[in-house]
Amino acid sequence: MNQQTFTQPKAQNLNLLAVIGFNGGVIDGLILHPDNETLIFPIGSQIVVRNVLSRQDRFLKGHTNDISTLTVSNSGRYLASGQKTFSGFKADIILWDLTTLSIVNRFSIHKFLIQSLSFSYNDKYLVSLGGIEDNFIIVWEIETGKPLCCNTAGSDFVHQVKFFNNSDNKIVTCQNFGIKIWTVDYIEKKVSSVDVNFGNLKRKILCMIIDPKDKFAYVGTETGDILEIDLQIAIYKRIGPVKRLFPQGINCIKLLPNKDLLLGSKEGIIAKINFNDFRIKKEGKVLGGVTSMTLTTECAYFFCGTEQSNIYWVETASLKSEIRNTCHNDRVNDIHFPYEYSGVFGTCGKEDIRIWNTETRQEHLRIHVPNIECYCFDFMRDGKSIYSGWNDGKIRTFLPQSGKLLYAINECHANGVTAICATSDGRKIVSGGMNGEIRVWKIGNQSQTMETSLKEHRGRVFSIVINSQNDRAVSASADGSCIIWDIINYVRTACLFERTLFKQIVYHPEESQILTTGTNKKITYWDVTDYTEIRSVDATLEGSVNSLSMFNSGEFFVSAGDDREVKIWEYDTSIPRFKGLGHSNPINKVIVAPNQEIICSVSEDGSIFIFATPKETRVAKRDLRKPQ
């Protein structure tokens, strides 16, 4: 047995082709650039710059953790982004040049979280607002990158900060139960504030918009109403909408050229409010609480982003919406391609299974099962059905074209079906549960019966694989064991032990060896003939390795895990040759497409990353040696 120590090799970076995802939880995080063609939004620690006409994506990488806020300057040249980090640590603000997609400057004074950012109308200054642990307002000079003045935002938590539209020394902040109007003295380098007089009215203010002449501000509250603020005399003027509130609160608000107000609520309602009498003129509904609205230059249409990570295209006049992009808004548990077909792939997570087009990255089909979570799924070898395991203990099989339920096997496992695999002929399904049971199901034309229940594991079963002969199954469990089962006679033939929680197991294409991985940060090679350990490789310095996938040639394999990196390893030498970066959350699964051209990975934040595979990994070395 050979133990290899971990030394960080120089691995080449993989080319990131596309990302399916959108962090809908970032307030005003979906921004349409002034050129009317570029859509900007965050995914984890990256910023996606997408051309809405060609759907070409470019990526801005520089943050070390999830992005918390975005803003674009009036000229469209600059983009400022802030991130969240850990308690007590500094959170970065990055200033980007959108013409070159490069970093202009990096500001690091705030702690834990950047709550809000705003540019002055002339692109000279940037104001930043820290989160609840910081609560400071800092004004930065863009040309020099230096902070000019700083002040605490007050005792209440501040939600948003904005520059006036025609002045670079006037700032407004909205906070719990108040609004402050700030004046910046650039000569003395200090900031002073005036509180807006609300009288006896108390509201928790979440968002605001300032009119083009800087006379009034309109703010949305957690109570679900809108307040008009006179910025000249710092006093509250009126309240609306008349005879109607939005119970869960107003997340974002926009001002139309005719002075009508456009608002988005936490319950998914888009409403247009008449400026004169504050009555609702039009109303629409989208899926998920509205967190972003970004208008086109003509204001005839706007993009709308929601908490459920959906992006809608909405007509301003009628408020009729059509969905343009969608993705998982919670962790993705599994990903698979159909057998020898790379045109589509499937993912599963909370409440649904989704089928995606590989080329367009659009959702083809969504199989929705409310209030439960899908832990695992796969396509039958013949492509005629999708079988899946859920946390209610059922195995459900669906038709791949319509998503219609074909059959369900009830009470398969007490606390959920956590791993599942079918034989190549589709006549048997082997499932594993949260409590460690392995059960074999016979699948007939009209019936599904349990053949046997094998109780050897004492912890959750994370992975099951079946060999090409359909007579052996290997299960990996959190109890530190991998068991090889004879699924003809239903007996245990061998057992592998390690001090780890096994996360996944894969066969080498020749089925002479198997690879295992888990929480011990290692990838272990095992011989199938006598089930002895061949060697163990330190695969990461951080967390566990959660997933493995083999290339068809058997000369390379892919790993991914808590270190948020996708790594391509050379099988014989156990050296990582390539790595894919971009994920900001632990990666749950990774898979190589059947055509060997792309690698797909899914993570805890619901994003799907698609990397291009290097040419040298697509063709086996033995094929390169063949005469042409």
Regions found by a protein language model. Name each.
Residues 3-10, 189, 196-198, 501, ...:
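Terminal intrinsically disordered, low-complexity extensions flanking WD-repeat/beta-propeller proteins
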Residues 6-25, 53-57, 192-193:
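A short helix->beta-strand "capping" segment at the edge of beta-propeller domains
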Residues 17-45:
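Beta-strand-rich domains and repeat architectures in extracellular enzymes and scaffolds
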Residues 18-20, 57-62, 103-109, 147-153, ...:
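Short C-terminal beta-strands that terminate individual repeats in beta-propeller domains
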Residues 25-31, 66-71, 112-118, 156-163, ...:
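Canonical WD40 repeat/beta-propeller blade segments in eukaryotic WD-repeat proteins
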Residues 36-38, 57, 77-82, 124-128, ...:
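Structural hallmark of WD40 beta-propellers
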Residues 43, 82-85, 89, 129-133, ...:
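Conserved strand-to-loop turn within each blade of WD40 beta-propeller repeats
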Residues 48-51, 90-96, 137-141, 161, ...:
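WD40-repeat beta-propellers
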